[in-house]
Amino acid sequence: MTEIRLTNTKSRRKEAFEPIDRKNVRLYVCGPTVYDRAHLGNGRPVVVFDVLFRLLRHVYGEGHVTYVRNFTDVDDKINAAALARKDAGDPRSLEALIRERTDETIRWYHEDMDALGALRPTQEPRATEWIGAMIAMIEDLIAKGHAYEREGHVLFRVRSYRDYGALSGRSVDDMIAGARVEVAPFKEDPMDFVLWKPSDDELPGWDSPWGRGRPGWHIECSAMADGLLMKDLPENERSFDIHAGGIDLQFPHHENEIAQSRCAHPEGEFAKVWMHNEMLLVDGKKMSKSLGNFFTVRELIEEYRKQFAVNNIGPAIRLRFLQGHYRAPIDAARHYIEQASVKLGLWWHFISEHLDAPITDKDRRDILATSPVIEALADDLNTPLAVTYIDGLVSRLRGGIQKQGYVDAEMDDLEMVAKRARVAIEFLGFTFDDLEEHHGPVQLKRLKERQLSASADVGVRIGRLLEERAEARKARDFARSDAIRDRLQAAGVLIKDSRDGATWELEPGFDPAKLGEPE
């Protein structure tokens, strides 16, 4: 059986993964707050942990993995969106408007994540379906001295859990010293956080021992993870395998989840392994509406459908996410997504040219049994290495690279090379037969043109560099000539020399930023 190694945020080490129960491997990923369209950053954890889900199913069997990803459908942002509709004249009750908004947003979310090629989780609980379990957990925490009620609020007593801060590597005293926010007067300690808060007549609420109110954000995931992944376990085994999410959730959300859950069930471990994907950047900066680099998944899909006849840019977004390791930030600016789309189109083209017969289930099993893609993913989800392997196979099909370290004698059969490439692509979550429609010749041509026109002076800059190179060659300054050639090649410009001079074309992966300025 393939050994999976994962970086555990809790231990800060890469560890061999051994599930608690190989017949029921359990994964929990924090899902969205459903008040608006998913932005691009929301998509990265979905894609990253979709790959993990696929890997776990491959190793342990499809029927032996439980993947839970929740919907937070009770939140002040949701309330604000519903109140805005009511203020605009909608006569319906706030409860009806909230339900409509959350149902609508969940539908959008499914559409957008489907477009990114993500499998649906095994379970997708809504927080509002688990209010009773949250109240029961809060009552238990109060009874054990870990929580207290003040003015209709229930707060978690942070100092009652001695390991608070271990996940994020923070000290409670240092956090208090560095805090610059006003502390609510009903708190015993500035670090205590809300488990339950009161609701006025206008806001949604549920009856509880502390009055009508609604849950705090952190208790939701603790209750849902417990109820769906650990409910039938003995107290001393109250643990599940992997808890994952974006790095922005590490503190305070995941730290607070651990504190609540470990205090409610002190003999259990809650989650054995914690995984966090790093931030998404756009043009080297964190996404922000004020910087003008913020966009939703749906906005990108519609933009590329209208401008470039790409019916679904989602696979290109997915590939861009997979080109970087999940524990490193990645830039998903438009030109990188376009480069990924071009790459998908080339993958489809060269594989299709060499693949005549359909791939059988036995073919897939045999190929995956020895595939370097599985090896790469088993090594802490090394998706960049998996993509590089596919690139190597496609290069072989293109007649470019004749030998790679991982290519064996079997690779003399180009149809087998194509089969291996297609199986690898599909394992990473791409539907091969859809690539022609979304990233075929028409889209490839338009996107290559877009790459050229993305910067108005790209052609001029390349021309000037080639002129400098020609002058250097004429002066027999071959070091200078080679340096210019290397710069152009690094940027993704293919140069073809002839008696009449040099011509050029853009390769997949062209990056105008690497051209620099002519000297």
From Swiss-Prot:
Q: Which reaction does it catalyse?
A: tRNA(Cys) + L-cysteine + ATP = L-cysteinyl-tRNA(Cys) + AMP + diphosphate
Q: List the disulfide bonds.
A: none
Query: Cofactor(s) for this protein?
Result: Zn(2+)
Primary gene name: cysS
| Residues reported in the UniProt entry to bind Zn(2+) | C30, C221, H253, E257
**Top-rank taxon, per record:** Bacteria
**Any one GO MF annotation of this record:** cysteine-tRNA ligase activity
Q: Where is this motif: 'HIGH' region?
A: 32-42
**Which species?**
Cereibacter sphaeroides (strain KD131 / KCTC 12085) (Rhodobacter sphaeroides)
Q: Which family does it belong to?
A: Belongs to the class-I aminoacyl-tRNA synthetase family.
Asked whether the keyword Isomerase is assigned, the reply is no
* Membrane-spanning residues: none
Localization per Swiss-Prot or TrEMBL: Cytoplasm
Its name, as the record gives it, is Cysteine--tRNA ligase
Identify the EC number(s).
6.1.1.16
Residues at which ATP binds: K289
Q: Is the Metal-binding keyword given for this protein? A: yes
Question: Where does it primarily localize?
Answer: cytoplasm
